[in-house]
């Protein structure tokens, strides 16, 4: 219907609405920026928390509605990726499972998780990511990207972890039964660092669920969203993501806190 065919009252009502300033203009701009800064992974709940932190007075439903108007929706990139299997049987020390899937640590640096995952690169090589995360805060404490999941990568992981652990802590560190975690070098080093090793049951990834969850997020939220040509680019992508994850990515399970905020509040 042409505007000239509308009833006079309807015509002027529409004209007035069109010329009226958008009261949500600032909030819309904030939503778009927050969505972009989150690698387009934040849904309306997280964006609502961020908006409230920034001083906007709005409801979750308002954010949901505005995201719809702006055409913003989360896309999960869950393409199949090959899993890295480091289990080669009993080749050294197999530690007891001290956690039994009780992932309820509240204090940072009491329980840590570690593992290695692999990523296929455009140049047909593989990149291997070794990480250590904190169970309580979900902070990524250490992450090492290498072209091989060998003892060298393991040593670099432990060297970096040693620099970042506070003095006088004696955390449990849980891993799978991968060959590298059974070695005499690993066992001796973690004990010297005051770490108590714990291991999953053979072939049970659920025993190390927090670590599996992080690697899943890393791949869905970042790595799987773009072709990564080589190891150098993978290192850059992982470094940027981990910095954002620790300092900026809020968790709905942690009352809207980032891992660093959680650790800071726990230490206060």
Task: List each model region and its residues.
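Mobile genetic element proteins and their domesticated derivatives, centered on retroelements
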Residues: 1-4, 11, 31, 47, ...
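Two-metal-ion RNase H-like nuclease active-site motif
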Residues: 110-119
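Basic, flexible linker segments flanking DNA-binding modules
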Residues: 9-107, 204, 260-266
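Short glycine-rich loop/turn motifs
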Residues: 125-131
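K/E-rich alpha-helical interaction surfaces of small helical-bundle regulatory domains
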Residues: 1-18, 37-39, 237-255
């Amino acid at each position: 219907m042409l505007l000239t065919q509308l009833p006079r009252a309807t015509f002027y009502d529409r004209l007035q609405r069109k010329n009226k300033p958008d009261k949500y203009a600032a909030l819309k701009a904030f939503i778009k920026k927050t969505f972009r800064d989150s690698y387009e992974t934040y849904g309306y709940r997280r964006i609502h928390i961020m908006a409230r932190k920034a001083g906007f007075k709005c409801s979750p439903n308002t954010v949901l509605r505005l995201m719809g108007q702006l055409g913003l929706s989360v896309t999960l990139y869950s393409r199949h990726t090959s899993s890295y299997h480091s289990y080669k049987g009993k080749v050294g020390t197999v530690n007891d499972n001290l956690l039994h899937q009780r992932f309820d640590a509240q204090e940072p640096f009491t329980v840590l998780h570690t593992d290695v995952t692999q990523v296929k690169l455009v140049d047909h090589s593989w990149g291997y990511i070794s990480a250590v995360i904190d169970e309580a805060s979900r902070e990524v404490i250490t992450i090492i990207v290498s072209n091989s999941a060998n003892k060298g990568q393991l040593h670099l992981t432990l060297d970096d972890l040693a620099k970042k652990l506070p003095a006088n802590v004696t955390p449990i560190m849980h891993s799978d039964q991968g060959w590298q975690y059974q070695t005499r070098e690993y066992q001796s080093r973690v004990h010297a660092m005051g770490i108590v090793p714990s291991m999953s049951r053979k072939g049970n990834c659920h025993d190390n669920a927090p670590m599996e969850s992080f690697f899943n997020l890393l791949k869905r939220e970042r790595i799987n969203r773009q072709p990564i040509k080589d190891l150098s680019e993978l290192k850059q992508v992982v470094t940027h993501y981990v910095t954002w994850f620790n300092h900026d990515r809020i968790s709905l399970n942690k009352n809207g806190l980032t891992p660093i905020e959680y650790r800071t509040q726990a230490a206060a």
